[in-house]
């Protein structure tokens, strides 16, 4: 890498933090998954907050704990997450609470910490000018094959992420901006839109009805590969329909194994499988099982392919509207700690003393 410095240091990598971009496409025939961000909308908004290209790599942080520090130069960074996430920023030993869904300027030595991701399972962290080597056309981390990211692994304390000189927050300081995520981009919806899958007819009429008319609950078995659901078993057509000759699968495929309980495949999913696929999640709703927490209740809603295409177009419109409505941030985030340390009263006056108004 040329014209770069090691500018962002990972002090604490948290529970599970990786570098991700849009993904690694066109290689599934070689057994290489897409990978990429679980929530592309949050990636695009986080990058816009720091004037990065929409597809630039970001840090995807599951469950919080990530703490990063600007090293020798100021950095412009941002975090997009649920509104109730706990974000702190400032000098390493005196971090104070900050609002989410905005950009921040970190002076050398200052830190930003994603203490908790709140009601969502992850947050997206962007840094202006991030520079990460690509592997097979993408910087996305796929740890099982040591691809992408920094050395193909999860982020670790002590890692340094390079930043382009031209993109650092040097010279005239940029004004941090904030956004308000519309409800649909908060991804708290309980309906997952799906289109009928290639083996929809492997399920009985009762099974098809159960699938689209029952409540399913996100289990604790969720990672970047997929999400298992608990609920009423979905009946296969017969015993022979419970398995198929392994064929191609993609993120969003909904497999129904012999247990009858659905598995929604996510970004790091394998490229082939032998369970019948009753449906495929519409791209607009694919972030839902990756973002929501165990116990969340969903219903699968069958829609047409045209409806699914229109849904992702609507998401893009929401992203563009959110970006167009960015507002400048007030530079100081006053919290209780700051107020307690501040002298808010200078002297004492007598309200009856007319001279006090002079």
Residue ranges, per PLM feature:
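Conserved "landmark" site that anchors the functional core of diverse proteins
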Residues: 1-358
């Amino acid at each position: 890498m040329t014209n770069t410095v090691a500018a962002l240091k990972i002090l604490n990598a948290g529970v599970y933090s990786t570098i991700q971009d849009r993904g690694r496409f066109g290689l599934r025939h070689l057994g290489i998954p897409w990978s990429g961000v679980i929530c592309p909308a949050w990636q695009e908004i986080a990058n816009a907050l720091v004037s990065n290209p929409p597809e630039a790599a970001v840090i995807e942080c599951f469950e919080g704990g990530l703490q990063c520090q600007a090293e020798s130069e100021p950095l412009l960074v941002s975090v997009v997450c649920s509104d109730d996430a706990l974000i702190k920023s400032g000098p390493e030993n005196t971090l104070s609470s900050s609002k989410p869904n905005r950009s921040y300027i970190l002076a050398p030595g200052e830190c930003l910490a994603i203490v908790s991701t709140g009601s969502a399972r992850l947050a997206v962290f962007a840094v202006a000018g991030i520079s990460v080597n690509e592997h097979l056309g993408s910087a996305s981390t796929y740890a099982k094959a040591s691809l992408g990211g920094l050395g193909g692994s999860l982020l670790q304390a002590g890692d340094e992420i390079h930043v382009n000189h031209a993109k650092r927050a040097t010279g005239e300081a940029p004004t941090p901006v904030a956004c308000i995520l519309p409800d649909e981009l908060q991804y708290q919806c309980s309906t997952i839109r799906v289109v009928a899958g290639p083996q929809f007819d492997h399920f009985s009429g009762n099974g098809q009805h159960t699938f689209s008319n029952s409540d399913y609950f996100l289990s604790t078995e969720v990672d970047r590969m997929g999400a298992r659901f608990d609920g009423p078993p979905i009946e296969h057509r017969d015993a022979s329909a419970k398995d198929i000759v392994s064929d191609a699968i993609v993120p969003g495929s909904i497999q129904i194994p012999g247990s009858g309980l659905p598995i929604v495949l996510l970004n790091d999913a394998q490229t082939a499988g032998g369970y019948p696929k009753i449906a495929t999640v519409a791209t607009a709703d694919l972030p839902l099982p990756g973002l929501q927490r165990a116990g969340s209740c969903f219903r699968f809603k069958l829609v047409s392919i045209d409806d699914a295409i229109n849904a992702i177009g609507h998401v893009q419109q929401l992203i563009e509207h959110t970006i167009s409505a960015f507002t400048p941030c007030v530079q100081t985030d006053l919290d209780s700690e700051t107020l307690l340390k501040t002298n808010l009263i200078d002297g004492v006056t007598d309200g009856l003393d007319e001279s006090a108004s002079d």
